[in-house]
């Protein structure tokens, strides 16, 4: 190479070609090249002194240059033909990379998926260790280029398996991320041929301790010798735990008899954690300290076009990702879902090449299961001719059925306008593809969706009317005016509604209209999402939720079924008992039997329980219709009074002296949910009535504590019991789950509150604040959850309607 005056790249803007051009420029060589399009990569090469031409022409090729081409360059390319006619020296990209690595300790990463991520992580670790490696990587990092010639003898590079060029390399260490049924057209359509090439490649490494392969990949397992890494217990580098917190991953692994705990990676997704584990193994093998590795992974800045944020607005999120194979798409969407919870995920997918789409036509439909909406657009052909077997509208229908999502086809030229009308507050859009789909994110960089119209509903007919107003007043402070326009709907004690924008003025009014009146109905119709902050009957028991479902409106808080079930304390006890959660022993009573046999009821209770006992109504709030009784006369009196409020009553064994422990929940028990707390509610005398709970009639409010002074085992126990109850009740929306903790350390379920108090003094919101949330984030989540519940139901209803239409035809 020393005597070569110049290198000319056909397609110099390509991510792989530009990396090698950068290395040559760093080493002092003269570089020129041509490409069809201007790009950031070309600008960065020009800044280093490269001469770059737009388009391909024979005049661009210097007479004395080595001409570099890649497998994507067509045989009839004018510059390629010119080089042949002139008998210029021609080098395939892989041959040049091999020459550039001569004399270096090369660490090569190959495999169907994850090459760029893994090689970028290895590069970042060696840079953090001050090793100054050379590298040629198929992606741009936020803080460095894709190619660089360093001062050390370490060289990190991707080794592309797609075109059979692995034969050119003699690596010192390798990572093989996985093998898939991809690019088999270069292997006579035979997977065995690809496996053989991978085997030959790995065998070039003389030290098997420097051959790392994915032990979770069934094709690699048994076909490669070296160090297996992955989640399977038999892997030599075993990832023993993984969890994702927002956009970061945390994992622990064992390797060579050592355990490395809680590695923090600034990337989401199990697949990225596996890539990072492989990078850790390589770095440890090369003698890099684990603390340096930790630091590098924690601050890793990611790779261009790998879940790269494209927009500015905080009201929604637009991400761009290079994923274009079904495995990559599924992994990417899974990591996004785990990061954003119940926010609506809109996947915008541009298939890459007709040949790849045809090969993967059976697997693509199931790749979008973690999305909520899929927009399918035109195939990026990369010069290929269309295939008759591919009909995008049919593929959209297959995606809908196989991924259980709404899917539609939108022409590429119409997508930006479509999204401007479709994106709403809190949406997460992910463009997927290796073609020119990146232009969509660029076009929406400064876009802001319109505000959501929120209807805050409060008051109500129950005796907890005043608490509802206090809760709504507190919640309204944290409804962001940047995201939402708020209207208030106040229900008076007679069930009449009034609406407006001025909450204090509405509270002072006393009149109202039927919810079916033209004024109220019109106001409800304009609302995007309803937010009920109602307590007790006609608001917390499924009644108002059913009304909202009839209106066809999203609503925050508990679903109809959770609200109705939780407000039936007897049904709640039966459900909890069925899943092994201890409940306070009780005896149910109904009004009909009580009226005919009160003496028998009293006798049964006295024989079952000892005094004091607790009398409770079955369908009222958590502190209404609840009485502590200490003798037979008081028992009869309070049962009679309780039946004035409810047709179902029960008597519980007293838990006086026990501690009242509460766990707060929001989200969907079947997918994403969060549990906060526990907290303790402490009364002055042990029994907390309605007045003490809220501080009425001059009584001091019951104290709320988050410092429970309990063992970790006890805290884990109550959270597990609360989780069991929430799942058994198919929790959707919100709930506070209350327990008694007796002197022996046993927990007993007391009740479940579907819309807990949300006043400034209430523990429900405080619990999430203690967990690190802001009040605004809690309110946002209520609205996100409401939209999620509604969207899922709409998708099901649309599918049902579609199937009905097909049957009719």
Swiss-Prot record:
Its EC number is 6.3.2.8, 6.3.2.4. Mg(2+) 1 binds at residues 738, 751. Binds 2 magnesium or manganese ions per subunit. Keywords: ATP-binding, Cell cycle, Cell division, Cell shape, Cell wall biogenesis/degradation, Cytoplasm, Ligase, Magnesium, Manganese, Metal-binding, Multifunctional enzyme, Nucleotide-binding, Peptidoglycan synthesis. It is found in: Cytoplasm. Residues 1-450 are annotated as: UDP-N-acetylmuramate--alanine ligase. Residues 573-784 form the ATP-grasp domain. In the N-terminal section; belongs to the MurCDEF family. In the C-terminal section; belongs to the D-alanine--D-alanine ligase family. This is Bifunctional enzyme MurC/Ddl. It comes from Chlamydia pneumoniae.
């Amino acid at each position: 190479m020393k005597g070569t005056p110049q290198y000319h790249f056909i397609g110099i803007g390509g991510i792989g070609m530009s990396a090698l051009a950068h290395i040559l420029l760093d080493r002092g060589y003269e570089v020129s090249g041509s490409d069809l399009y201007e790009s950031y990569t070309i600008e960065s090469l020009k800044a280093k002194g490269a001469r770059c031409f737009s388009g391909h022409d024979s005049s661009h090729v210097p007479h004395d240059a080595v001409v570099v081409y890649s497998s994507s360059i067509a045989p009839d390319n004018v510059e390629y033909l010119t080089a042949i006619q002139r008998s210029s020296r021609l080098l395939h990209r892989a041959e040049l990379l091999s020459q550039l690595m001569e004399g270096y300790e090369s660490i090569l990463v190959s495999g169907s998926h994850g090459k760029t991520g893994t090689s970028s992580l290895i590069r970042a670790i060696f840079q953090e260790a001050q090793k100054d490696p050379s590298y040629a990587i198929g992606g741009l990092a936020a803080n460095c280029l894709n190619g660089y010639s360093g001062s050390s003898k370490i060289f990190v590079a991707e080794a592309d398996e797609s075109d059979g060029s692995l034969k050119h390399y003699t690596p010192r260490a390798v990572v093989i991320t996985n093998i898939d049924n991809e690019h088999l057209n270069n292997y006579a359509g035979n997977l065995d041929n690809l496996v053989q090439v991978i085997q030959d490649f790995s065998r070039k490494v003389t030290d098997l301790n420097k051959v790392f392969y994915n032990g979770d990949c069934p094709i690699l397992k048994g076909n490669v010798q070296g160090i297996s890494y992955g989640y399977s217990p038999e892997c030599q580098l075993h990832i023993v735990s993984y969890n994702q917190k927002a956009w970061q991953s945390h994992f622990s692994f064992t390797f060579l008899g050592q355990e490395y705990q809680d590695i923090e990676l600034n990337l989401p997704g199990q697949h990225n954690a596996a890539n990072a584990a492989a990078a850790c193994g390589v770095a440890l093998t090369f003698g890099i300290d684990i603390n340096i590795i930790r630091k590098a992974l924690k601050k890793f800045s990611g790779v261009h076009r790998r879940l790269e944020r494209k927009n500015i607005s905080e009201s929604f999120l637009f991400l761009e990702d290079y994923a274009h194979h079904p495995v990559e798409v599924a992994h990417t969407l899974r990591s996004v879902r785990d990061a954003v919870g119940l926010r609506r995920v809109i996947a915008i997918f541009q298939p890459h090449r007709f040949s790849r789409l045809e090969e993967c036509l059976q697997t693509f439909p199931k790749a979008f299961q973690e999305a909520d909406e899929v927009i399918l657009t035109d195939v990026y052909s990369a010069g290929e001719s269309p295939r008759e077997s591919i009909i995008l509208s049919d593929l959209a229908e297959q995606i809908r059925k196989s991924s259980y999502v709404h899917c539609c086809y939108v022409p590429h030229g119409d997508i930006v306008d479509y999204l401007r009308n479709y994106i709403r507050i809190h949406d997460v859009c992910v463009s997927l593809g290796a073609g020119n789909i990146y232009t969509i994110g660029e076009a929406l960089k400064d876009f802001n969706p319109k505000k959501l119209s929120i209807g805050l509903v409060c008051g109500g007919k129950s005796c907890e009317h005043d608490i509802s107003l206090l809760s709504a007043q507190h919640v309204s402070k944290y409804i962001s005016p940047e995201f939402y326009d708020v209207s208030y709907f106040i229900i008076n004690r007679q069930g009449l509604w009034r609406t407006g924008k001025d909450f204090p003025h509405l509270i002072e009014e006393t009149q109202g209209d039927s919810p079916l009146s033209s004024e109220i109905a019109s106001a409800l119709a304009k609302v995007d999402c309803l937010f009920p902050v109602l307590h007790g009957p006609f608001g917390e028991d499924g009644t108002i939720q059913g009304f909202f479902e009839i209106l066809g409106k999203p609503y925050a808080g508990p679903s109809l079924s959770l609200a109705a079930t939780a407000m039936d304390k007897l049904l709640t006890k039966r459900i909890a008992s069925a899943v092994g959660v201890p409940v306070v022993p009780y005896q149910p009573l109904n009004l009909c039997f009580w009226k005919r046999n009160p003496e028998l009821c009293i006798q049964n209770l006295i024989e079952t329980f000892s005094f004091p006992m607790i009398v409770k109504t079955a369908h009222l709030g958590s502190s209404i219709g609840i009485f502590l009784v200490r003798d037979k006369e008081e028992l009869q009196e309070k049962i009679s009074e309780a039946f004035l409020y409810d047709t179902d009553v029960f008597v519980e064994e007293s838990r006086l002296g026990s501690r009242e422990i509460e766990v707060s929940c929001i989200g969907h028990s079947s997918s994403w949910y969060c549990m906060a707390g526990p907290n303790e509610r402490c009364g002055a005398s042990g029994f907390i009535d309605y007045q003490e709970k809220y501080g009425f009639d001059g009584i001091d409010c019951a104290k709320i504590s988050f410092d429970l002074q309990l063992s970790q085992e006890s805290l884990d126990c109550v959270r597990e019991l609360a989780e069991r109850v929430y799942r058994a009740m198919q929790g959707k929306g919100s709930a506070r789950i209350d327990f008694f903790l007796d002197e022996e350390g046993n927990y007993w379920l007391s009740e479940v509150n579907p819309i807990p108090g949300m006043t400034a003094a209430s523990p429900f919101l405080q619990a999430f604040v203690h967990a690190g949330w802001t009040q605004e984030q809690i309110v946002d989540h209520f609205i996100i959850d409401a939209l999620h519940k509604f969207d899922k139901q709409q998708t099901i209803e649309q599918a049902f309607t579609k199937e009905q239409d097909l049957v009719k035809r």
